[in-house]
């Protein structure tokens, strides 16, 4: 880890920095910010587990930034955003206030909460982005990140909702709610597993079980409550320990990442995969790694949906260029490009009705891949995200009571 951090710190010294600090940028016009950003480099730290997402960023986004703004985008792949949050915190504690390693991070949830608590985010500027007008900030699912108000500290990039994938040729009648899934696991030993938390997707599956054990999300909304957690978590650990002997490899080990789960599904070792981003299912079929008979669905008792964002750290030396990147990502054209089935299939974080007519027409022409459950179908049974303190407690409790 120390070696990797040293490499990242070296990377930061090679980037050209903006000359204006954050407060000076807030007093500029957008034209002045673009001029300040010209010739800059943005080190964007983001999850790197999807070749299609990586290609969209490295080819389409980076290509447009270079051609239109002379900005170099350096995509830095990571597996866990928490490590980068800790890096930024370490820099702050070391007094590195204007020459940080990270210019932009793909983030949400408990990692955003940590950035807020540590005063690690650059805030109060998002209204300067011209394409901020495309965002519906009246939507609480966008204005709040896992229950934490965004308050001008991050910019939405995608909206997602959890879904399950199965091979319809092998599992034509999948379990449609959590109770049925638990029964199915017991009746089909070795055919199900989930990534071990704190893997992002594994943690999400765990929260679905937690919500099921609570009898629904109503008691879990709002700030963390220890008494409620104690009651619901006891039921959750009992359920998970009850099904553990029926999991893949009898629960002796868990996939470390969703990528490993996807490989197990591709190899036919397990009957299900799942993801916050169902578009990944269609891309896996198109790539030939998953069967053509892959189909996906949400649970009738609901699946969790959320928004993910990009954030500029307080000590980024390239804030103007990072703001230009965020504005491009919000544009109707860039949101349309990533929504295309053959590119990514990601759901937009903007109001399509606010975009240009040709962009609206482009969205209307998109045909959802047959392996991807339509977002409108998932939205009929959407569950809210829990606030970040719940996530931390659930993950810690799983490690102590199930994964030990």
Identify the role of each PLM range.
Residues 39-43, 69-72, 99-103, 188-192, ...:
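Loop/turn elements at helix/coil->beta-strand transitions in domains of secreted/extracellular proteins
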Residues 22-110:
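Early extracytoplasmic/lumenal segment of secretory-pathway proteins
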Residues 47-60, 75-85, 102-259:
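Extracytoplasmic ligand-binding site segments that recognize negatively charged/polar headgroups
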Residues 18-30, 263, 369-404:
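Conserved C-terminal helix/tail region of periplasmic/extracytoplasmic solute-binding proteins
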């Amino acid at each position: 880890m120390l070696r990797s951090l040293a490499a990242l710190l070296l990377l930061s010294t090679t980037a050209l920095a903006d000359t204006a600090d954050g407060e000076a940028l807030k007093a500029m016009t957008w034209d002045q910010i673009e001029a300040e950003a010209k010739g800059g480099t943005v080190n964007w730290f983001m999850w790197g587990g999807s070749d299609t997402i990586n290609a969209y960023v490295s080819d389409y986004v980076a290509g447009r930034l270079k051609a239109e703004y002379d900005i170099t985008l350096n995509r830095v792949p990571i597996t866990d955003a928490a490590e980068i949050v800790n890096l930024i915190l370490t820099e702050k504690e070391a007094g590195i206030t204007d020459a940080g390693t990270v210019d932009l991070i793909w983030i949400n949830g408990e990692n955003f909460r940590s950035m807020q608590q540590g005063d690690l985010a650059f805030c109060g500027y998002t209204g300067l982005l011209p394409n901020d007008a495309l965002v519906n900030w009246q939507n609480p699912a966008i204005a709040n990140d896992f229950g934490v108000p965004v308050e001008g500290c991050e910019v939405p990039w995608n909206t997602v909702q959890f879904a399950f994938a199965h091979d319809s040729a092998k599992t034509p009648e999948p379990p449609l709610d959590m109770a049925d899934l638990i029964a199915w696991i017991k009746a089909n030993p070795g055919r199900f597993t989930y990534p071990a938390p704190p893997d992002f997707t594994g943690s999400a599956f765990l929260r679905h079980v937690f919500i099921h054990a609570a009898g629904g999300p109503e008691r879990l909304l709002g700030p963390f409550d220890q008494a409620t957690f104690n009651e619901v978590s006891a039921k959750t650990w009992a359920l998970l320990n009850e099904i553990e002997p029926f999991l893949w490899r009898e629960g002796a080990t868990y996939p470390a990442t969703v990528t490993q789960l996807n490989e197990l599904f591709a190899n036919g070792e397990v009957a299900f995969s799942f993801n916050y981003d169902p578009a990944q299912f269609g891309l896996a079929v198109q790539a030939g790694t998953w069967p053509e008979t892959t189909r996906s669905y949400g649970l009738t008792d609901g699946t969790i949906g959320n928004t993910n964002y990009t954030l500029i750290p307080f000590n980024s030396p390239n804030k103007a260029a990072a703001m230009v990147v965020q504005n491009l990502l919000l544009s109707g054209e860039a949101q349309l490009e990533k929504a295309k089935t053959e590119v990514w299939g990601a759901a937009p974080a903007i109001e399509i009705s606010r975009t240009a007519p040709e962009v609206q027409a482009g969205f209307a022409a998109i045909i959802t891949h047959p392996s991807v459950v339509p977002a409108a179908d998932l939205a009929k049974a959407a569950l809210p995200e829990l606030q970040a303190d719940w996530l931390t407690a659930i993950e810690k409790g799983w490690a102590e009571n199930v994964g030990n």
